[in-house]
Amino acid sequence: MSDPGFLAAPVLLLLLVSLASASLEQAASRDDDSAERPLSKRHSEGTFTSDYSKYLENKQAKDFVRWLMNAKRGGSELQRRHADGTFTNDMTSYLDAKAARDFVSWLARSDKSRRDGGDHLAENSEDKRHAEDVNALLDRTMAKTFIEWLEKQNSNDQTD
């Protein structure tokens, strides 16, 4: 045992083992630190997001209350608008019904004058051609008016 190499080998081995364990501990502690950093970072980001969400909710609630208060102060304007719209709708319905009645009465008069011999006004062939042209023009105009009225009724029915 007096051999220095015999003692140096175990001491060297012990030194290597302690260095290895120390470096492993340092690596493990670095891993723990790096694992804690993202958690704390995520926690702080989550806290910020939560606080910001609460702020936005409060702001929206205040804006809504402000809107309600303004609507309550100017409520007569909203009622007036509704009344104006109701009047306009009623007037449109009345005018549409009147146009339909006028058109039906025009058709009835036109049919009656044809049956009664409405051609007695046009004595010669030139007058007859002119009357036919006028009648054709009136028929086209009334047909166009009737189609527009029907389309308007259809669009009103679709919006309601």
Curated annotation (Swiss-Prot):
Keywords: Cleavage on pair of basic residues, Hormone, Secreted, Signal. The keyword Signal applies. The keyword Secreted applies. Residues 1-22 form the signal peptide. GO terms for cellular component: extracellular region. GO terms for biological process: response to starvation. GO terms for molecular function: glucagon receptor binding; hormone activity. It is found in: Secreted. Residues 23-40, 74-79, 116-127 form a propeptide. Pfam families: Hormone_2. Residues 112-132 are annotated as: Disordered. PROSITE patterns: GLUCAGON. Belongs to the glucagon family. PANTHER family: GLUCAGON, PRO-GLUCAGON. Promotes hydrolysis of glycogen and lipids, and raises the blood sugar level. This is Glucagon-1. It comes from Petromyzon marinus (Sea lamprey). The lineage of its organism: Eukaryota, Metazoa, Chordata, Craniata, Vertebrata. The gene is gcg1.
